Swiss-Prot record:
Stretch list, region Disordered: 53-88, 139-177, 341-376, 421-492, 666-700
Region ranges (Interaction with BICD2): 12-152
Modified residues (Phosphothreonine): 18, 158, 479, 609
Keyword set, alphabetical order: Disulfide bond, Isopeptide bond, Membrane, mRNA transport, Nuclear pore complex, Nucleus, Phosphoprotein, Protein transport, Repeat, RNA-binding, Transferase, Translocation, Transport, Ubl conjugation, Ubl conjugation pathway
Protein's UniProt name: E3 SUMO-protein ligase RanBP2
Family note: Belongs to the RanBP2 E3 ligase family.
Region annotation (2 X 50 AA approximate repeats) ranges: 499-627
UniProt organism field: Bos taurus (Bovine)
Region of interest: 11 X 2 AA repeats of F-G: 125-1067
UniProt pathway: Protein modification; protein sumoylation
Length: 1085
């Protein structure tokens, strides 16, 4: 009872999971209410604590803890791991020694001794604590219900009291389930009493008979299972992840595996499959990745059939297991899980067993045996052990990075306040510290830092702070990574699992350079790669060689030589040939020196262009020719003073400088003291003489100034400030006008240049629209036929066509283009044709019949609707069409023309007698048929052919009746008879309506449609479309206007309509004939 009350008080004092939130009165009341509700769960604790056997176990546990200190004692967690997950309830030790107030001397790990256990008080708001620490650890997800504690303090998950949840973990409300569900549901796959004989990953297909192709059924492990009891064998395959059945049937003796054509890794068979729950015959195929797996499947399949007959178990195929699939979590997550499991199970054992010379916490002992357990992925949770480590009042541990705490911290470091040295054992342990060595597999191993190895006794101090006997109040930081770097490679323990394939090592020069620049030693190792190309290295050997062959040089040997002055260049240099050099005159040199400009600054301002250098003739000789040509010109042309150009550079001629374009670099710059007072006209350099005697052109070089009396310190700011609104360089001329003003800037040049070589001209080719290019290969012209060549356009307007979609019950666009009404002048029929814009695809193509009726659309006055058998898609299809024009006048015009075409078709049609009187002539040939039905004579049919209207068609029929071409209608049959419609025959090749042959070859064209199908007894040609006539024909049994303009009428029954009626009696609506109707004899009368 006393123990139960203590447990109840502890439960009431459970701290919040979010310590940053203050507890208000309402929250406290809720906690008290929940504690009362948890009394039912405490019954299990009371039973556990009052059990005598449990007390004995507690005493034994205390004795074992007195002999050995493990990492689990710090957090109160058990040293032995169990399969149950760690819960927050495990953080509170409910044993008697947990309430002891005595505090023993703690070590670096702060492990309490069994003789003087540390009281594990919980944090309470308002109470002061002696220390504060913070640690990261891999907390485990809590279970639904609080588990029982075993004898060692481990939490064992139970199925009882599952409705009691940890309310402190969340701030939300608690919802009770409406229907309680059991915690554990037994999953049964139906394969429990069967052994897996074969299992491998494959892809399954089934044959779809409707589509006529193989379709994928699923991907997964296909298994061959055998029942232990009845020895029955079946094939089961489930899809990956969803585990849905895609194959489930038994293997019967009559099943056979066959290879699919084209591949040997695919097996095909037929079975009664139950994958969908019902019996269904399926044609299945399975494809494996490797050939040997496919062969193994075949072998096991055959063995299964024999095993069922002889009633014995098959030896499972273990040569190859199921293909492993990658885990959803990555390799790093798996490594973390393995590391966490290893730390929780082996860390404390490895520390105590490996290092017997160093004491951890001042106590050595034998650890308790541990068992492996599956640990959930680590995550940080406020609660569990963290509650005690954050808000505990026990003595704090010294701060250290990398300390191997017993909590199995995943992050490997903790924040603790420094601790006073209470014992020599604790001091020595604190001075030595602990180091973490990270192995390649991710495992962390704790080693003593003052030992170099297990057999080496040399002490190695890692930090000056640890040399002191007494710890100061300041925190001490220790970085085990730096310590590990100081270790020599031979000191580190070798790992057989790591194989060094390649090591990147720098050269001594690269190492020295990296050390001087304070960079990593391998920083410049990228230069050692074979594909590395340095940008600083000159890769110009091939170019230098080529240039030296031309007595030239591409690059200078020294960068200093790039700044050679003119006086260093001599005429006798072999690698540089000076063709022509322009030197400044005395005046130009004086001007440049006055204005602090280069000596050659004023050279070539007026005449030095690109075209000068491109001429093959010498500059001086060409200049002399120009001077002589200019002497014949007018010598009275005035010129203004130009102090910027000399005799050499002032001359500008059409050959040396384009006279059509103004030269903007030839502005005259003069001083007021030397400017002319009488001549203010601009200088035309193209007409100016070289030796001009005008005094305005003779300027002393020493008196030339740039601007208004500027000295050596001239600046553009001074020019701007002294400007009074007039020109800064001389006076403004009111009559000033640029040369060639108004001329075309980008026009073609009308005159050719004097003395220019025609072959070596670099001038740009002027665009000419009359340039004509002849094709290299002449292509023949392709004649495009649209089928409208023999037709006359009666109407043509742009419109938009619609068709009525019966399934969607709405109008849909058919196309936009020109709709036409065409009249065939030869065949005498009318049709509507419309093609889409640009693509010219046919969107309407049908003949106009007298039964068609145009009706206006209800929603628009310029839209018309009609129904027709349209051939836009190549086949006849009844479509309801609508056309919309831009205006109502266009729609009325279309309707008027449409009705006129119908009136031409509705001309008084003559009956059978009138047709006979009109088309019948004595010169027309007459032929006959003798008909027999299953050897029973029916009579003779006499027919007259319209050779005067369709001579070609009539001649074909006559020749087939006489058989003069070696083949004909004799012994042929009437293969299709439809009452009240037609009697069709004439298939002299296949006798089923798919053959036929004419005397002109395979087929011939339609002649005309002058004669319509106005009544019974008319002979007409059967065809498969336009211009596909052969030997097949039909006799009409009734008026058939829908056949007009499609079939050519070439005769009529003159005598024997009673025989035709007898043939009609053997027909059917579908066209099949009940008796065999044969033409026993035929010919011409």
């Amino acid at each position: 009872k006393q123990k139960f009350e203590e447990c109840q008080r502890l439960l009431l004092d459970i701290p919040l999971q979010t310590p940053h939130k203050l507890v208000d009165t309402g929250r406290a009341a809720k906690l008290i209410q929940r504690a009362e509700e948890m009394k039912s769960g405490l019954k299990d604790f009371k039973t556990f604590l009052t059990n005598d056997q449990t007390k004995v176990s507690d005493e034994e546990s205390k004795d074992s803890r007195a002999g050995a200190t493990t990492a689990a004692d710090v957090s109160g967690a058990p040293n032995t791991e169990t399969t149950g997950p760690t819960l927050e309830w495990d953080n509170y030790d409910l044993r008697e020694d947990a309430l002891d107030d005595s505090v023993s001397s703690s070590s670096v790990h702060a492990s309490p001794l069994a003789s003087s256990p540390v009281r594990k008080n919980l944090f309470r708001f308002g109470e002061s604590t002696t220390g504060f620490n913070f640690s990261f650890k891999s907390a485990l997800s809590p279970s639904k219900s609080p588990g029982k504690l075993n004898q060692s303090g481990a939490s064992v998950g139970t199925d009882e009291d599952s409705d009691v949840t940890q309310e402190e973990e969340r701030d939300g409300q608690h919802f009770e389930p409406v229907v309680p569900l059991p915690d554990l549901v037994e999953v049964s796959s139906g394969e429990e009493n069967e052994q897996v004989v074969f299992s491998h990953r494959a892809k399954l297909y089934r044959y779809d008979k409707d589509a006529g192709q193989w379709k994928e059924r699923g991907i997964g492990d296909i298994k061959i299972l055998q029942n232990y009891e009845n020895k029955q064998v079946r094939i089961v395959m489930r899809r990956d992840q969803v585990l849905k059945l895609c194959a489930n049937h038994r293997i019967t003796p009559d099943m056979t595996l066959q290879n699919m054509k084209g591949t040997e890794r695919v097996w095909v068979w037929t079975a009664c499959d139950f994958a969908d729950g019902e019996r269904k015959i399926e044609h299945l195929a399975v494809r494996f990745k490797l050939q040997d797996v496919a062969d193994s499947f075949k072998k096991i399949f055959d063995e299964a059939k024999v095993a069922q007959e002889k009633d014995f178990l098959i030896t499972p195929h273990v040569a190859r297991s199921a293909t492993p699939r990658e885990s959803p979590c990555g390799k790093m997550a798996v490594a973390v899980l393995e590391e966490t499991t290893r730390e929780r199970t082996d860390l404390s054992q490895g520390d105590d067993a490996a290092d017997t010379t160093s004491e951890v916490g001042g106590v050595s002992g034998t650890p308790e045996p541990t068992t492996k357990a599956v640990v959930s992925p680590p995550k940080f949770v406020f609660g569990s052990e963290s509650v005690k480590s954050i808000f505990s009042s026990e003595k704090s541990k010294p701060f250290a990075f990398g300390n191997s705490s017993a909590t199995g911290s995943l992050f490997g470091f903790s924040f603790n306040t420094p601790l006073k040295n209470n014992s020599s054992e604790a001091s020595s342990a604190a001075q030595s510290g602990s180091e973490r060595k990270v192995e390649p597999g991710g495992r962390q191993e704790s080693q003593n830092s003052d030992l170099k190895s297990a057999s080496d006794g040399k002490v190695k101090n890692t930090s000056p702070a640890f040399l002191k006997e007494q710890f100061s109040t300041s925190h001490t930081f220790k970085t085990p990574e730096k310590v590990e770097e100081r270790k020599k490679p031979e000191d580190l323990p070798s790992d057989d699992d790591v194989l060094i394939v390649y090591e990147l090592t720098p050269t001594p020069e690269q190492r020295a350079l990296a050390s001087r620049l304070q960079l990593p030693p391998t920083f410049f190792c990228y230069k050692n790669r074979p594909d590395y190309i340095s940008e600083e290295e000159e890769d110009d050997e091939d170019f230098d060689t080529a240039v030296k062959k031309l007595n030239g040089k591409l690059y200078l040997d020294d960068s200093e030589t790039c700044r050679l002055s003119e006086e260093n260049v001599t005429d006798n240099e072999k690698e540089c040939v000076i063709v022509w050099e322009k030197k400044p005159t005395v005046e130009e040199l004086a001007k440049a020196d006055t204005l602090k400009l280069p000596p050659t600054f004023f050279c070539g301002i007026c005449s030095d262009t690109d075209e000068d250098n491109g001429n093959a003739e010498d500059f001086q000789s060409e200049l002399q020719k120009v001077q002589e040509a200019q002497k014949s010109q007018d010598e009275n042309i005035a010129s203004s003073a130009d102090g910027m150009c000399t005799d050499d550079t002032k001359v500008t001629v059409p050959f040396l400088c384009k006279s059509e374009e103004p030269e903007f670099t030839t502005k005259s710059v003069s001083s007021p003291s030397v400017s002319s007072g009488t001549v203010d006209k601009p200088v035309d350099l193209s007409t100016r003489k070289e030796n001009d005697a005008d005094s305005t052109s003779q300027v002393e070089s020493k008196t030339v100034t740039f601007g208004f009396g500027s000295g050596p310190g001239l600046s553009f700011a001074d020019l701007a400030s002294s400007n009074s609104g007039d020109f800064a360089f001389g006076s403004k001329d009111k009559n000033f006008q640029w040369a060639n003003t108004g001329a075309a800037v980008f026009g073609a040049q009308s005159t050719s240049k004097v003395g220019e070589d025609e072959d070596g001209s670099d001038e740009e080719v002027v665009h000419n629209e009359d340039i004509h290019f002849e094709p290299i290969v002449s292509l023949p012209e392709v004649e495009v036929k649209s089928g409208e060549e023999d037709e006359e356009i009666l109407f043509k307007e742009r419109a938009k066509l619609y068709r009525w979609d019966r399934e969607a019950s709405q109008w849909k666009d058919r196309g936009v283009g020109d709709i036409k009404i065409l009249w065939h002048t030869v065949k005498n029929y009318f049709r509507i044709l419309m093609r889409r814009d640009q693509v010219f695809k046919v969107c309407a193509n049908h003949v106009i019949t007298k039964t068609m009726e145009l009706k206006p659309l209800n929603v628009s006055n310029n839209a018309l609707v009609w129904t027709a058998s349209d051939y836009a898609d190549g086949e006849a299809k009844v479509e309801q069409l609508a056309v919309r024009f831009k205006t109502k006048e266009m729609a009325d015009c279309f309707k008027k023309k449409f009705e006129e075409c119908q009136q031409n078709l509705l001309k008084p049609q003559k009956g059978q007698d009138s047709l006979t009187a009109e088309f019948s002539k004595e010169t027309n040939p007459v032929v006959f048929f003798d008909i027999c039905a299953d050897d029973e004579p029916l009579g003779r049919i006499t027919m007259e052919l319209f050779s005067n209207i369709v001579p070609k068609t009539a001649e074909n029929f006559r020749a087939l009746c006489t058989g003069e071409k070696g083949f004909g209608f004799k012994s042929s049959i009437f293969h299709r008879v439809i009452p009240d419609f037609v009697c069709q025959g004439g298939d002299i090749t296949k006798h089923d309506g798919t053959g036929g042959r004419s005397i002109y070859g395979d087929k011939f064209e339609d002649e005309n449609f002058d004669v319509k199908h106005t009544g019974p007894g008319l002979l007409s040609m059967a065809n498969r479309g336009q211009d596909t006539n052969n030997s097949q024909f039909f006799i009409t049994l009734k008026k058939a206007e829908r056949l007009d303009f499609k079939h050519v009428v070439f005769g009529f029954v003159k005598d024997g309509m009673d025989t035709v009626k007898k043939i009609e009696s053997f027909g059917s609506p579908k066209g099949s004939v009940s008796r065999r109707i044969i033409i026993t004899e035929c010919g011409q009368i």
